[in-house]
């Protein structure tokens, strides 16, 4: 297990990170200087650093280069925006790293196939973290790394669009939502958005839709 502190849990002067005793199978990067750790059994080189400040505007990774040792060279990189270590991912990949495992954003995002990706949070952090969450799994085959995203979260935040017609009623809207929830399952958490054109005389009660399972938000964008 390779662990580094990011901007939310950065290593303050009095942080427990500084002298915490980790388990033998955990490698923790303790400062803001890029360090390389080799796994002798697997011939894997892991490069990483931890945040000692909440914001770091310097591109600390841009000068990073893999060593010359035979094996797999993996860069752990947290950030990617102007306030949290801006970086040139394509440039780092071209510099010779076999894979760049990225952190900072909560949603999974593949930047370079089998080369660089944000795994995202294992579970959604808030209702704006829509879609699947999980982890990136890698397999080394014949000297080539193959990766794939593995869904893991127990629940996900999903968005349901309910389209109104001129003959729609509150009851028909509720029936539409009930059917949609039945097909998606009741394990997830939903944001409902009402769209479309409605009859002038139609009185909608959007808040009533919150009683249909795990609905946390209802937005009426109809006209």
Each model region followed by its residue ranges:
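Accessory, non-catalytic peripheral segments of nucleic-acid enzymes
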Residues: 145-223
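His/Asp/Glu-rich metal-coordinating catalytic cores
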Residues: 1-139
């Amino acid at each position: 297990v390779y662990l580094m502190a990011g901007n939310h849990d950065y290593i303050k002067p009095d942080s427990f990170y500084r002298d915490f005793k980790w388990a033998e199978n955990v490698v923790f990067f303790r400062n803001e200087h890029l360090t390389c750790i080799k796994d002798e059994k697997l011939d894997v080189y892991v490069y990483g650093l931890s945040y000692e400040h909440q914001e770091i505007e310097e591109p600390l990774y841009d000068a990073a280069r893999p060593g010359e040792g035979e094996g797999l060279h993996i860069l752990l990189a947290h950030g990617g925006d102007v306030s949290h270590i801006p970086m040139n991912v394509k440039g780092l990949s071209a510099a010779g790293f076999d894979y760049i495992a990225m952190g900072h954003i909560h949603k999974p995002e593949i930047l370079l196939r089998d080369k660089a990706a944000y795994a995202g949070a294992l579970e959604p952090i808030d209702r704006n973290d829509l879609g699947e969450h999980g982890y990136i799994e890698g397999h080394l085959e014949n000297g080539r790394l193959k990766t794939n995203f593995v869904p893991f979260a127990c629940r996900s935040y999903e968005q349901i669009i309910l389209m109104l017609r001129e003959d729609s009623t509150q009851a028909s809207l509720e029936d539409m939502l009930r059917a949609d929830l039945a097909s998606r399952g009741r394990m997830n958490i939903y944001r409902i958005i009402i769209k479309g054109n409605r009859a002038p005389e139609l009185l909608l009660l959007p808040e009533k839709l919150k009683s249909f399972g795990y609905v946390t938000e209802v937005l009426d964008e109809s006209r």
